[in-house]
Amino acid sequence: VYERDAAITMELIPSTDELIFFNASTDPYTNNNGGIMLGENQETVDNIIGSANYDIGHVFSTGGGGIANLNSPCSPSEKARGVTGLPTPIGDPFDIDYVAHEMGHQYGGNHTQNNNCQINPGTAVEPGSASTIMGYAGICSPNIQPNSDDYFHIINLREIADNVTYGTSSTCFEEVVSDN
């Protein structure tokens, strides 16, 4: 979705496996508290990987929902502050409605739904709970559909492009020239 819609390619770092914890009693995360996990993830990724060795970090849990710092890639103290949690973290709803949504905040995207749930007046351009990635499809009435479609609204693409071109996240992206 990010590559197709926003021309952003993400690559896993070679030492990603060092950030996978199999023992809940020894891992550094508070599974059911996304707010606390934001700081825990920043500290953990920086300590294990090193701040200079990655541009964006995101942690997954089996807790509920998600939370992320806005415009955080490339920012040394915020770039790993993204959390996505769901009791059953599998399938398209998890990948699109939660992971792509929370990473959308990290890249600079605000909510697009026009209802009473987490509304952002400047980007509330979709009816009801919205239907694109940065909306709340199926989460908060009036629901237009049960899950998000797998694309960004143009208003979010503009926000993301502005952030990675001119904003906080512009400092670490590499432009690749294409023959297109």
Feature map (PLM): residue ranges:
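Extracellular (secreted or membrane-anchored) zinc-dependent metallopeptidases
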Residues: V1-N180
